[in-house]
């Protein structure tokens, strides 16, 4: 307070295997044991409110950890009711060999697809293999993430820094022509039209109901 601080942004502290500094969330409603407990956070939040200091949290919308219960269910079978929570596609045959559904590259290197041996299909992951991308075209996924946001806002946080928000939409699954082999063509999954649609929905169903701050990282 003496430093003139009036807002604190807390990076991901959710339960996580820590493959990517906590951005691989295993449970959105729990605090990682590396950082303490939910009760510890409530104490920090209470003290911050007493000092009139706002607290915002990182909110990861694009993906979860591959250890999240949704993904464990999703990968278990093609008929699971959470299958469409993530982006699954069949591989294709090229020169007599199976290859990923497209030649798109990941921000972290290699393909943007990872084959899962349980159902022999590929899930999309534009970051780490351990961070499967959520399927934002699925209304159930959007509703689930709105519930997550509501839970934290009801707890008393003052808003969110929304991580990697420009990547929530996907182009049709066709090979990039911007190079040979695996191609990091971010136009295939960044700044696409439905991102704005999803954010308008989130504003209507979540943010507009609270006096909070939402900062989108693009």
Protein language model regions, located:
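Hydrophobic residues within beta-strands of alpha/beta enzymes
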Residues: 8, 160-162
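Conserved protein kinase catalytic-loop anchor
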Residues: 157
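Acidic/aromatic-lined carbohydrate-recognition and catalytic surfaces
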Residues: 1-150, 154, 167-218
């Amino acid at each position: 307070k003496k430093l003139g601080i009036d807002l604190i942004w807390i990076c991901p502290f959710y339960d996580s295997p820590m493959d990517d500094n906590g951005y691989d969330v295993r449970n959105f409603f729990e605090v990682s044991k590396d950082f303490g407990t939910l009760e510890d956070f409530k104490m920090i939040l209470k003290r911050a409110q007493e000092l009139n200091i706002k607290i915002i949290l990182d909110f990861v919308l694009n993906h979860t950890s591959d250890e999240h219960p949704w993904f464990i269910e999703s990968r278990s079978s093609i008929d699971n009711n959470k299958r469409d929570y993530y982006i699954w596609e069949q591989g294709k045959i090229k020169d007599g060999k199976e290859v990923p559904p497209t030649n798109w590259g990941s921000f972290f290197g290699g393909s943007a697809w990872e084959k899962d041996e349980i159902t022999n299909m590929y899930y999309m992951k534009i970051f780490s293999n351990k961070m499967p991308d959520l399927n934002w075209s699925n209304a159930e996924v959007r509703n689930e993430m709105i519930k997550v946001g509501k839970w934290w806002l009801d707890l008393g946080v003052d808003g969110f820094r929304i991580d990697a928000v420009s990547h929530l939409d996907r182009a049709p699954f066709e090979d990039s022509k911007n190079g040979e082999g695996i191609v990091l063509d971010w136009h295939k999954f960044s700044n696409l039209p439905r991102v704005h649609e999803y954010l308008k929905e989130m504003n209507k169903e979540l943010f507009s109901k609270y006096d909070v701050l939402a900062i989108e990282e693009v």
